[in-house]
Amino acid sequence: VDRSLLFVYGTLKKGGSLHSVLGNSSEFVGTYITEENKYDMHDVGCPIMLIDNDSYLLNESKGFHIRGEIYNVTPECMERVTTIECNAGYVPFIVEAHEENYPEGEPLKAIAFIYPHAYGHNAGSHRITEKENIKEWVA
C-alpha cells in the first residue's frame, strides 16, 4: 500500500477536534518543525498556515517555522483529509521538516495543507504560541 507522509499543525494534531479523521491506520512519526521559516500561522477559529508573503516575494526567510506532527497515512486517509481540507479552502503543499529533537537529522518531505494566500491582518491569538521564531497551534 502506498502510504504518504502528512504534516498536520492544527485541528488534525493529537487532541485536536479533527484528529479522529486520521483513523487507526495512521502511524505517528513524530513532532517536526518546518525547515524553512517562510510561513505564518493565523487563527480564524481554526489555524491556517500560509506562506509569508514577504518571505515568498523577496525570496527571503522572514517568516516563522511551524511545529506540527507527521503521520504516515493510507491513501484512504489522505483522501479523507484532502476532501476536508480542500473544501475548507486549503491546498496541498510539500514541506520539508526535521524532527524536533534531532534538528541535524535528514528532513522529511510531507504534504501539508496550507492557505493559498494572505488572510488579512493577524490579530494574534492565545491559541498560537510563538517562541524562538517557531509558531505552534495549541488546542
Each model region followed by its residue ranges:
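Glycine-aromatic micro-motifs
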Residues: 1-139
